[in-house]
Regions:
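Recognizes extended acidic, P/S/T-rich segments that occur
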Residues: 2-41, 51-55, 76
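Accessory beta-strand-rich segments of carbohydrate-active enzymes
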Residues: 40-45, 50-52, 64-69, 82, ...
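Terminal edge beta-strands and adjacent linker/stalk segments
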Residues: 59-62
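Acidic, His- and aromatic-enriched active-site or binding-groove loops in soluble protein domains
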Residues: 69-76
Length: 222
């Protein structure tokens, strides 16, 4: 039976909250530390002990705090020539420069219908149905990827994002045309945090390239 716990929360190498041992049988605990940074991996370590004083090993979990509205400065972009009869995927690309030593680099991405993200030609994930489907007129999900030094290098780098229609368009078996149908669109924000404390962002805007590619049809049924 649970009799006590210890929780330590760290972010960017510094401790944000440390409870020490608390005598309690509570299975949920409200965070009581300092404000967690956005876009930086947060690690949580938990240990528990029973009434006999026997302690468990340390259990770890990690997460990234989501974007706040004040930090979400990027534009929705698409291909203006895309028509209602088109079903091809759109390919978006942007080069950027890593100028000095990074501490973290975080990519927030919402490609509707579905996206495939590469950094310097290497896929970030094997997921094929990101972001989660929603009614795009009301709510849009986004993904978060914390990039490593193996994925980014000093100098010129490139982010490429292919966006297929998915649930964004195409022909449904019943002939319906939902209100959330439309062109494939992309919203993305890459936040580069340097060791000297400076921050740079690479956001979707009119400087991104967009083109068609090898995928000529990418609806949910085709």
């Amino acid at each position: 039976v649970l009799a006590g716990y210890s929780v330590t929360v760290t972010a960017g190498g510094s401790v944000c909250w440390q409870t020490g041992w608390i005598e309690s049988d509570a299975s949920s605990v409200v965070y009581g530390g300092r404000e967690l940074p956005v876009g930086v991996p947060v690690e949580v370590m938990v240990s528990v002990r029973n009434r006999a004083g026997e302690e468990s090993g340390e259990a770890w979990a990690s997460f990234v705090v989501g974007l706040l509205p004040k930090g979400a400065h990027a534009e929705w972009i698409t291909d203006g020539t895309y028509t209602g009869d088109d079903t091809a995927a759109l390919y978006f690309r942007r080069e950027f420069t890593v100028r000095r030593e990074l501490t973290t680099a975080t990519l927030y991405c919402a490609g509707i219908g579905y996206q495939s993200v590469t950094i310097n030609g290497t896929a970030l994930s094997d997921a094929h149905l990101d972001p989660a489907h929603t009614d795009y007129t009301r709510l849009i999900s986004y993904t978060v990827d914390v990039l490593t030094s193996m994925e980014l290098s000093p100098g010129t780098n490139a982010v490429g994002i292919a966006v297929g229609l998915g649930w964004r368009g195409g022909k449904l078996p019943n002939g319906m045309v939902p209100s959330f149908f439309g062109r494939p669109m992309l919203w993305a924000l890459l936040v580069l945090r340097y060791a000297d404390g400076t921050v740079e962002t690479v956001a979707t805007d009119d400087r991104w390239q967009v083109s068609r590619g090898a995928i000529t049809s990418a609806t949910i049924y085709d």
